Every structure is written in C-alpha cells, then in structure tokens.
C-alpha cells in the first residue's frame, strides 16, 4: 500500500552537518567511499562499506554500463559593472541573435538596461548589455556583441575566459577543478553542472570494468539550469520539472536490446543517465527508442522503471528531485535510513562526495523493469 507521505516534499528532508559536505574530491577518483545498499531480503539496513574501486566486483560479464558523456561548459564569466563592482554571469542557453539566458550575480545589481564588461579582457573590455529579466528562470537576457552571434564563437569565448561553474555549496576552488569537475569520458559540451557519479570513474577503474566483460555505452543529457533549483511543490502529485536536452542514439538502444538478450543488466552511472534512458522510453510509449530533444520526466516513488536495473549515484540534497528519483528505486524511508547510516559513518555528500551502489536486487519489486 502506498504511503501518502511519499507525495509530500517535506518527507524528503534530512539534516546534514556542514562538515559532511565535500569541498574537494579525493584522489584517485576511485578512492571515494561506497555504500552498497543491501538487497531487499536482507535482515538489516546496515549495508556494506567499501570504495568505488570495489564496485567492479559488483558487476558481471554481460552487464551494460550507461554513462552520460556531457561536458561541463566553462560557463561562468566574471564581469565588471558600470559602477566598478564585480559580478558573474552563468551562460545557460541561446535566445537568438547573440542573446543568451544567464544567471546573474548579484542579481539585484545587474538589472535590465545595465552594461557590464568581461573582466578578463582588461586591455579591450568586451561590453555586454543586460536586456531583460527572465521570470521563468530568475535569470537575465544578455546581449553579446555581433562577433558572438554564432554559438561556436560563444563556446570559444567561454573556453578561453570562462570558469567551471561549481555548485554554490563548494566554497574551496582551485585550478584543478577545470579537470576534476569533468568525467574522464566527457566529450559533448553543453552542461552547466557535472553528472557527478561519473566523477568517480578513473581510467584505471574503467579499464578494469571492461576487462570483466562489462559493456559500456553513453547517453547525452546536458545538465541544465534546473539542477540549481530546489523543488518547491509540497504536493508532489502536482510536481513538474525542468526539461533537459537529451540524446539517446540508435547504437545505445541496440546495446540495451543486446544486453537484455544475453541476460545482462542495465546499470546507470548517475541520475542523469537514468533520466535520459527512462525519458527516451517514456517518449517511445514504454519501449526504449532513439531520442534527440528535451525531456521533462518526473521520477518519484510509484514510478515503474522501464530500462534501468541498477544505479551508481552520489548522495543528494534534501528535498531535491534527485532524492525523489533514488527513492523511487529503493523507497523513501529506506533511503533516508541509509543516508543517516552514511552520515554516522562519515561519508561525504554532494558533488565531490562519496557514492552509493543500488544493485538490481536492492530495487523495490514494484519498481523493477518488467
């Protein structure tokens, strides 16, 4: 019987000591701690503790690992305001004719009609015009000069002068973030945040996984503005979520079909891979089909998965859509108990934090693909 609390946002809250928010990644990547969720039939919720390197022992020959190959844009530009103060623009998406939707900081001091200059170009500053506010996002529409009408020109500008946009809860920055806040297989620029479960996969671990006969394939989901937005709808039966651009290729669909035929399991690396796979299946009427376009799928308790059997994931923020997604796999109360266990055992949370492994045997019976 469904628990009515599963549809209340307040039921997905938990308290996290500030010291448990990871400020820097561990080295090597695969040295992060790993909490392995016990199977449904287990007599306790204690779980097993290891490292992400140990995760290879949980995988089987014939399994299919699906990763998200998006690459984080160096989308944060430092600007100087007309009064001399500094600000930031997080460049998000094109709005045509050299106009781009940006998140602005400080928002109250970057208003429509203001002009700012790219801070990195001290000798020949590049003027940018704040045209309008965007009520849907809380951002600003910013006009770039004519030389930057083309998206490729903007990408080149960001690559040269931009910075990786780390989440606001990471306050310790250094030059290594440019490499460390990307997965090793990131190849398709377009995200403003990393698919963080993939940050744990080192070259050595990927090689070891392939050596076990595990197949690998990729989807693309460009993590967008919504990743910075908290869920605000208390009644989750009325929840709608931001859309994110997804590409699921014919080759990926064929790889999933081949995995099923050989008796393998589809293992998603990260919630973004889950959303891409399940979104493509939903668009296909329940069957996984190639897809290129936006996905706004809501995954929360009561959802029956169509593609994904298991998940490697990080520990997520309270009341977030990602927490709802993981709860759909293993149950809300069970998830919160496991989070309490992780906190008690000094696991590190969020983007640069540790990981959780949800094996197919740990997934709720009603949620499993049929």
From Swiss-Prot:
Compartments it resides in: Cytoplasm
A GO MF term: S-adenosylmethionine:tRNA ribosyltransferase-isomerase activity
GO biological process assignments: queuosine biosynthetic process; tRNA wobble guanine modification
Main location: cytoplasm
Cystines in this chain: none
One Pfam family recorded for the sequence: Queuosine_synth
Transmembrane segments: none
Subunit-structure text: Monomer.
The protein, known as: S-adenosylmethionine:tRNA ribosyltransferase-isomerase
UniProt source species: Synechococcus sp. (strain WH7803)
């Amino acid at each position: 019987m469904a628990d009515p609390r599963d549809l209340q946002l307040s039921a997905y809250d938990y308290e996290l000591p500030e010291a448990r928010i990871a400020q820097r990644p561990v080295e090597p990547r695969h040295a992060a701690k790993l909490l392995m969720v016990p199977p449904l039939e287990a007599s306790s919720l204690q779980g097993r503790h290891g490292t992400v390197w140990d995760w290879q022992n949980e995988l089987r020959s014939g399994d299919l690992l699906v990763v998200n190959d998006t690459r984080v844009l160096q989308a944060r530009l430092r600007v100087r305001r007309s009064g001399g103060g500094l600000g930031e623009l997080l460049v998000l998406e094109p709005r045509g004719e050299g106009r781009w939707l940006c998140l602005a900081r400080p928002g109250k001091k970057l208003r429509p009609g203001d002009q700012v200059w790219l801070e990195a170009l001290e000798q020949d500053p590049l003027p940018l015009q704040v045209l309008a506010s965007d009520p849907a996002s809380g951002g600003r529409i910013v006009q770039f000069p004519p030389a930057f009408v083309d998206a490729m020109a903007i990408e080149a500008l960001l690559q040269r002068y931009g910075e990786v946009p780390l989440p606001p809860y990471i306050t310790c920055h250094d030059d290594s973030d440019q490499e460390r806040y990307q997965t090793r297989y990131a190849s398709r620029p377009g995200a403003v945040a990393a698919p963080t479960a993939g940050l744990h996969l080192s070259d050595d671990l990927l090689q070891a996984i392939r050596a076990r006969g595990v197949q690998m394939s990729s989807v693309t989901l460009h993590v967008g503005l919504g990743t910075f937005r908290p869920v605000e709808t208390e009644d989750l039966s009325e929840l709608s979520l931001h859309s994110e651009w997804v590409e699921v290729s014919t080759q990926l669909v064929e790889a999933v079909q081949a995995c099923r035929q050989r008796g393998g399991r589809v293992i998603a690396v990260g919630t973004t891979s889950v959303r891409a796979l399940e979104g493509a299946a939903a668009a296909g009427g329940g069957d996984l089909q190639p897809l290129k376009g936006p996905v706004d799928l809501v995954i929360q308790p009561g959802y029956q998965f169509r593609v994904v059997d298991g998940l490697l994931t990080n520990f997520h923020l309270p009341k977030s859509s990602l927490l709802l997604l993981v709860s759909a796999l293993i149950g809300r109360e069970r998830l919160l108990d496991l989070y309490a266990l992780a906190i008690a055992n000094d696991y590190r949370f969020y983007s640069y934090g540790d990981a959780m492994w949800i094996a197919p045997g740990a997934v709720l019976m009603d949620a499993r693909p049929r």
